[in-house]
Amino acid sequence: MSINIEQAIIHEISQDSQGQLRCRLRPQPLLNSQAVEMMLEELHQTYTSKSGKGFGYFGIHGDDGEANPAFSNALQEYRAGDLGFVEFTGQASKLLQEELAKYDFSQGGFLLMSCYTSMASDFLFVALLSAKSSMTVLDDMELSQNNHLDLSNIQLAARIDLTEWQADKDSRKYISFIRGRAGRKVADFFLDFMGCVEGVNTKAQNKTLMNAVEDFVASSDLTKEERQQCRNKVFEYCSERFDEGADIEIKDLADELADQGMESFYDFARGGCYELDEEFPADKSTLRQLKKFSGTGGGVTISFDGGHLGQRVIYDPISDTLLIKGVPANLKDQLDRRLKGE
């Protein structure tokens, strides 16, 4: 396993017959069974691989608007040994219930909270899971309907880097969270119950890094192939950091490029007009543009590796056209069949 589980528990928040939200609290932590280990390992991997996560910190009431300090205060007591895990998670469940009661779109769910260690850091994972209906075949070959936790489609989840939180009080990114397909407004209650305030615009930082890389290669004496190698190296480094759940470090990235003979990127990035933090989380979807060009519009979708530009793919900005040399075999087959049919 890639994680070492300390404790985990599930509480339920559901509607009663009058439509009021109620908490059903589990009186003790989950046993460290194989089922629990498999569930948390799957959730850890699924969460870590999610791109486009937001990052924030525990807000201060007044300085950060109406940020509620109740969750972070209880977490502090738990970490100090003044509050048990069951009591802490029970308080958190009631905070979430109170926050959910302000909205009319939620049916509740199962609140999973787990403390675990991964790569020498302590984490608190918090997720509101939903049940999903499925069918199974019984021993007598009859069908039966049952419910199971939908682990592959988590939309309301956050992970707190407890080690960073307690070691660096000035950090603004020790809480990561899934933004959710439904948009930020629906996920607001999940951040509000923890008193979380967004602190780092990950996409903006990654976009700025990408711009700095493009300006760096454009101002260098590198050949076209070497420029693409530089882009590929940056993407490779950032992808590795993303997969490890670690931050991009500008100095570390510059050292990687220097090893490839591309000196002075650190001074270039820090000395220019780029407002780059020394460290920030990676966003694969943004940085993928270093390797690929892609776009959709008017019923046309095009995607190709950056190395093909100027060779297999010719762009003419004056005529607003793309010329593709060597049509992919599967596309060529479809086009030939259509022409024969006409």
From Swiss-Prot:
- What GO molecular function annotations does the UniProt record carry, in alphabetical order? double-stranded DNA binding; single-stranded RNA binding
Locate the transmembrane regions by residue number: none
A GO cellular-component term linked to this record: cytoplasm
Localization annotation: Cytoplasm, Nucleoid
Which keywords belong to this entry? Cytoplasm
NCBIfam families with a match to the protein in the record? PRK00378.1
The family line of this record is:
Belongs to the YejK family.
What is the protein named? Answer: Nucleoid-associated protein Shewmr7_2293
Ranked from the top, the taxonomy reads: Bacteria, Pseudomonadati, Pseudomonadota, Gammaproteobacteria, Alteromonadales
